[in-house]
Amino acid sequence: MTAFADLHHADAPLLLPNAWDHASALALAARGFPAVGTTSLGVAASAGLPDGAAATRDDTLRLALALGSQPFLLSVDAEGGFSDDPDEVAEFARQLWVAGAVGINLEDGLGPPGRHAAKIAAVKSAAPGLFVNARTDTYWLGGGDGDGDGYGDETETLRRLELYQQAGADGVFVPGLTEPRSIDALVKHLTTPLNVLYSPAGPAVPHLADLGVRRISLGSLLYRRALGAAVETMTAVAAGRTPQGTTPSYEEVQALSRPVLSHRAHG
């Protein structure tokens, strides 16, 4: 078992912050988080591209290359692998592994579960040490906690997750799942660690831990809050008010580039 996989079996769930660039990743790691993920929305929006449209393959790989040698465990949000061809997804995953990533997040987008399972199997064959977090979008795109059409309910969710487990997934991810009873039911049926997306309106971290959740991702929340803080700061200044909140100093932000400069100097 890898160090990253071990974090999914510790006493407390893995709380995974999601970064969108070098500075955000290094700042989070500096606060003691042993692993940092990326957010596909943050990466896409920063590049002026849409999320979930397979448009950010190069941007995602570029960020992985910048972060893979840093002193934290890196997991990459790769949307659906940027292709419907399992071999192409596997090759991209192999490149992430070579770059230094230890995990990959692959979402099914409510597409054919057999196709997604084939992607997972191909990735595990190409990069056996890469932790594959298989995401199903039954709750994210399927209408929330049950909408009567087979999506957003436990039966369809479990059907997909069991198929992904059989294909070799190391963990499974159900964003949008917040109802404690449904979380508890899934945990009892799964053989791999369950990952959920943190929601300010959902259960708190201690409650999720009690339910058996093993990984809690922040997704795009940090990126969206950073955008909100920037706008609020400018609005306050324009209104003659002193901006509130914590602001890193110029020197603190500048210091975040030193690991990269040091790596390049000795590379």
Language-model-detected regions and their locations in the chain:
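Active-site mouth loops of central-metabolism enzymes
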Residues: 7-24, 49-57, 74-88, 131-156, ...
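Extended, intrinsically disordered, low-complexity segments
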Residues: 221-267
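N-terminal amphipathic alpha-helix/helix-capping segment at the start of soluble metabolic enzymes
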Residues: 1-18, 22-30, 121, 125, ...
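Glycine-rich, proline-tolerant flexible connector loops at the mouths of alpha/beta enzymes
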Residues: 35-61, 80-84, 104-118, 123, ...
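Conserved anion-binding
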Residues: 98-167, 239-258
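Alpha-helix-loop-beta-strand connector modules within alpha/beta enzyme cores
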Residues: 50-76, 99, 112-135, 178-203
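Catalytic beta/alpha-barrel core
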Residues: 16, 20, 102-110, 153-154, ...
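Catalytic cores of alpha/beta
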Residues: 24-30, 82-95, 200-213
